[in-house]
C-alpha cells in the first residue's frame, strides 16, 4: 500500500504502489497494489479488505506510512499537527484495529509499527511527527500485551533510511543508508520465527540495536517537600543501574509493584526501628 502523495501527504498517485507490486510479481511473488489512505478509518479498512479479498487472510501487518509537515512549535498549525497524526499514529490504529481481531481469531499474527528517533529523542520543527511516533510505541505495547495469549506479536522498528521522505535534506555526508539496511530487521520481526513482542528495534546505517524505556532506581521517602526533591535530585536522576520493565508480560504492573514494595520495605524498616526504640 502506498498512497503515492507528496511529503506533506497531499495528492494521490497509484504509481509507487503499482511499481513495487510489479517488482514483487516479477520476482516470483504475489502482490496487489492499493492506494487507499491510512489517514481515515475507511482507508484503513479498505487496505485490510484488499488483503483479505486477494489472499484470504492477514498474517503480517507492517505500518510504515508517513508524511512530514515542518514548522517550529511556535508556528505549527493545528491543521499540520493533525495531518501528521492522521497518518502516523491514527493511521497505525486504522489498520491495526481491523487486522488485530482477525489475527487473534486465527491464533497467529505479526505486527510491525514504525517509530522514529524523532519520537524517542525529539527533533526540532517536527512536534507533530515526534508526538505521533512516540504514540506508536504505546499502541504497540497494548497490541503486544493483548495479543500475547493469541499468538499475535507486535514490535516497533525505529529506522533511518534515505527514502522519498528525505527529499530536501543534504545527505551527501551520510554513510550508506539504503532501505536494504532496514528491511531485514522488519523481515525478521514479521517472520514466524520472531520470538519477541513488545520491543523496539533500531536500524540505522547498518547498526541494529534494541531500545528500551528505563528508570532510575529512585529515592523513597514517606513524605516530600519541594526542597527535599531539590536536595535528592542527584540520587533521583542516578541511572547507572537502570530499571527496565518490559511491556510483556506485565511491565505496567511490575512498575507499580516495584514502587509499592519499596514503600512497604521502608515502612517495615522504620516500624522495626521505632519498635526497637520503644523497647529500649
Label every model-predicted segment.
Residues 156, 174-278:
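C-terminal helical subdomain
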Residues 74, 121-128, 149:
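Active-site loop immediately N-terminal to the catalytic Tyr-X3-Lys motif
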Residues 116:
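Residue(s) in the substrate-gating loop at a strand-loop-helix junction
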Residues 96, 132, 140:
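Active-site helix of classical SDR
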Residues 14-18, 35-46, 78:
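The beta1-alpha1 cofactor-binding region of Rossmann-like NAD(H)/NADP(H)-dependent oxidoreductases
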Residues 24, 72-73, 80-85:
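Substrate-binding pocket helix/loop in short-chain dehydrogenase/reductase
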